[in-house]
């Protein structure tokens, strides 16, 4: 099961909501996954998740005392998945329920956008967001890129949902798609906040663990790359210094050098690959990095004079 499916499964099992929050969650599910059929009036809510279908069935009964029937169907193209259709037939109370959920007016005309009365409270905003995610949402595995999105049918609903996200501290962005719009979050902190707001605490824990692991892996990779680059610079500098010292020795002889320069020259000829700090630790008595660097620069200056004299001649 994917991370997105695990998250939905967890959210679908949240129970014990107060009436206002249950209404907000159910309204979002019906708004995004529902379809109103006329003559006689009938509401159809479709989902691929059995737990979501059970949630809708129970919420309709508890909130409005509406009778519903759940039908299981095979999807025509993807045979591996079932499709669950919650059918609410024409009955007393259906019209007022549709109006209360913001699906239509009293005269059963389709109502666009989000009904503001549903999300006046902070708790109801979170519940509506949870319902919208259960209906048409998805979240990427945190082992990849950070991305959470909710697909809606029109720009008005997308703008309303983005505005709802802003009220709970989320920066939902809009993007048009071939068959509608998406409201999405890209930042890792924003995705984590959304999971927390919706109540997906187990998914949030998995998300944060994966984020920590990925951040640590990236940090280690950066350090390794940095160490590799530094090692390359150290080796290149050591080889250059070795060549200069051999030039000086060939021209003047090692014994003609002063004891301090002779000591460092011998160490560098013996250990061309080590860093200045390590070279200083090999000396007896040990030398500081700056001291080793100063002596090697002296030797390189002598070598440069030799090369310059050759050029003039």
Curated annotation (Swiss-Prot):
Which keywords label this protein? Cell cycle, Cell division, DNA-binding
- State the Gene Ontology terms under molecular function: DNA binding
Keyword Acetylation listed: no
Q: Which GO terms describe its biological process?
A: cell division; regulation of sporulation
Residues in the DNA-binding region annotation = 275-308
Q: Looking at the record's lineage, which domain of life comes first?
A: Bacteria
* Pfam families xrefs: HTH_WhiA, LAGLIDADG_WhiA, WhiA_N
| UniProt keyword Cell division present | yes
Q: Which family does it belong to?
A: Belongs to the WhiA family.
Please give the function described in this protein's UniProt entry.
Involved in cell division and chromosome segregation.
This chain's protein is named Probable cell division protein WhiA
Lineage of the organism: Bacteria, Bacillati, Bacillota, Clostridia, Thermoanaerobacterales
């Amino acid at each position: 099961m994917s991370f997105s499916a695990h998250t939905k499964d967890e959210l679908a099992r949240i129970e014990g909501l107060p009436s206002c929050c249950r209404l907000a969650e159910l309204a979002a599910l019906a708004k995004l996954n529902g379809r109103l059929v006329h003559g006689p009036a009938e509401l159809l809510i479709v989902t691929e998740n059995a737990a979501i279908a059970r949630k809708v069935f129970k919420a309709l009964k508890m909130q409005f005392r509406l009778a519903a029937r759940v039908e299981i169907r095979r999807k025509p193209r993807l045979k591996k998945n079932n499709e669950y259709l919650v059918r609410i037939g024409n009955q007393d109370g259906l019209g007022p329920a549709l109006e209360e959920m913001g699906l239509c007016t009293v005269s059963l005309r389709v109502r666009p956008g989000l009904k503001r009365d549903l999300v006046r409270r902070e708790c109801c905003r979170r519940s509506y967001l949870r319902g919208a995610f259960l209906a048409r949402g998805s979240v990427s595995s945190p082992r990849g890129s950070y991305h959470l999105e909710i697909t809606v049918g029109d720009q008005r609903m997308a703008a309303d949902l983005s505005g709802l996200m802003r009220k709970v501290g989320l920066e939902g962005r809009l993007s048009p798609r071939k068959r509608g719009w998406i409201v999405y979050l890209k930042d890792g902190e924003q995705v984590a906040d959304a999971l927390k707001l919706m109540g997906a605490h187990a998914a949030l824990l998995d998300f944060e663990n994966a984020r920590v692991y990925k951040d640590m892996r990236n940090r280690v990779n950066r350090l390794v790359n940095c160490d590799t680059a530094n090692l390359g610079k150290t080796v290149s500098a050591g080889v250059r210094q070795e060549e200069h010292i051999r030039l000086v020795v060939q021209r003047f002889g090692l014994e003609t050098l002063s004891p301090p320069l002779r000591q460092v020259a011998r160490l560098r000829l013996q250990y061309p690959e080590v860093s200045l700090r390590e070279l200083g630790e090999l000396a007896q008595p040990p030398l500081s990095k700056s001291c080793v660097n100063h002596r090697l620069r002296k030797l390189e200056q002598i070598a440069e004079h030799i090369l310059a004299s050759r050029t003039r001649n």
